[in-house]
Amino acid sequence: MTATLERRQTASLWERFCSWITSTENRLYIGWFGVLMIPTLLTATSVFIIGFIAAPPVDIDGIREPGFRSLLYGNNIITGAIVPTSNAIGIHFYPIWEAASLDEWLYNGGPYELIVLHFFIGICAYMGREWELSYRLGMRPWIAVAFSAPVAAATAVFIIYPIGQGSFSDGMPLGISGTFNFMLVFQAEHNILMHPFHMMGVAGVFGGSLFSAMHGSLVTSSLIRERTENESANNGYKFGQEYETYNIVAAHGYFGRLIFQYASFNNSRSLHFFLALWPVVCICVTALGVSTMAFNLNGFNFNQSVVDSQGRVINTWADILNRANLGIEVMHERNAHNFPLDLASEVSLPVALNKVEING
């Protein structure tokens, strides 16, 4: 009998690293997309926290009137924000080494670009990581497809809109009150409430919430008891069990009698596909709407569009909305320009009809 001894093959450091990166046995899956995601999101998060606490004033309008938005300059959690990059920079790539000094980089709002660009790369890598993990586990790729909707929305707001407007100063400030300010200014300049793509987004968000609540309540109400009536239905499910944990026939029958028969799904796969499809499609359409409004393809304007037989204007809510838009636009960037473009281009109205004479 002959025994053969072979030298044991030892994996190189790179091979062991690759095996660890792509292993699905880790507590948290890393993956090759994770190699890109982790440093970019850590960078964006770290700079955001530091800037939110201690960033110096930023000259957002490029007119030497810096705005104070960090906590150390008297703001709180509500009013604090990372101020967008200065209008003097426009849409130029503005890393630290492009500025003459660190103080100049901070004064021109360089941290905003750093955070936004790293965040954008990070969430794209997170979406790729979702696909990668699904691929390793033999799952279908629809989780990453669903996450593409918020990625598209963030891309539209933080990347496409500033490019279309010609400056990162038009981007959304990274803070609570800054977000609301961005929404008001967006409405004033683009009339987004009258844009059909925004209406689809509203239907997606509220409709998705309604559908999720309906589905969750129906499932919870039709759980299957395991053995006896004395056992709680809440304890009936065991992780990994092969059989259904709720009775879809009962849920279908209940909802069909509550509304009408064809308002409910009798197929679990089509039901859950619809629950995923509805908000994803609507949010993607809204992102497309923001992307078109970035290049000033705005919402409908029905200002003074309803007249009587004599040509006199019949005021509608569209006229009220238009007046509100003008008012918001006048208040916005009040020191950067005297009047909004659509106000300055209007025919001037007489303020006084008769000259007032003063007899002293």
UniProtKB/Swiss-Prot annotation:
UniProt-annotated binding residues for chlorophyll a PD1: 198
Residue stretches in coiled coil: none
Binding locations of pheophytin a: 126
Chain positions of site Tyrosine radical intermediate: 161
Documented EC number(s): 1.10.3.9
Residues holding a quinone: 215, 264-265
PROSITE patterns: REACTION_CENTER
Highest taxon of the lineage: Eukaryota
Propeptide, residue positions: 345-360
Keywords: Calcium, Chlorophyll, Chloroplast, Chromophore, Electron transport, Herbicide resistance, Iron, Magnesium, Manganese, Membrane, Metal-binding, Oxidoreductase, Photosynthesis, Photosystem II, Plastid, Thylakoid, Transmembrane, Transmembrane helix, Transport
Modification after translation (UniProt): Tyr-161 forms a radical intermediate that is referred to as redox-active TyrZ, YZ or Y-Z.
Co-factor remark: The D1/D2 heterodimer binds P680, chlorophylls that are the primary electron donor of PSII, and subsequent electron acceptors. It shares a non-heme iron and each subunit binds pheophytin, quinone, additional chlorophylls, carotenoids and lipids. D1 provides most of the ligands for the Mn4-Ca-O5 cluster of the oxygen-evolving complex (OEC). There is also a Cl(-1) ion associated with D1 and D2, which is required for oxygen evolution. The PSII complex binds additional chlorophylls, carotenoids and specific lipids.
Localization terms from the record: Plastid, Chloroplast thylakoid membrane
Catalytic activity, reaction form: 2 a plastoquinone + 4 hnu + 2 H2O = 2 a plastoquinol + O2
Gene Ontology annotations of biological process type: photosynthetic electron transport in photosystem II; response to herbicide
Site positions (Stabilizes free radical intermediate): 190
Binding site for [CaMn4O5] cluster: 170, 189, 332-333, 342, 344
NCBIfam families, alphabetized: psbA (TIGR01151)
Family statement: Belongs to the reaction center PufL/M/PsbA/D family.
Protein function: Photosystem II (PSII) is a light-driven water:plastoquinone oxidoreductase that uses light energy to abstract electrons from H(2)O, generating O(2) and a proton gradient subsequently used for ATP formation. It consists of a core antenna complex that captures photons, and an electron transfer chain that converts photonic excitation into a charge separation. The D1/D2 (PsbA/PsbD) reaction center heterodimer binds P680, the primary electron donor of PSII as well as several subsequent electron acceptors.
Binding partners and assembly: PSII is composed of 1 copy each of membrane proteins PsbA, PsbB, PsbC, PsbD, PsbE, PsbF, PsbH, PsbI, PsbJ, PsbK, PsbL, PsbM, PsbT, PsbY, PsbZ, Psb30/Ycf12, at least 3 peripheral proteins of the oxygen-evolving complex and a large number of cofactors. It forms dimeric complexes.
UniProt name for this protein: Photosystem II protein D1
Source species of the chain: Galdieria sulphuraria (Red alga)
Gene name of the encoded protein: psbA
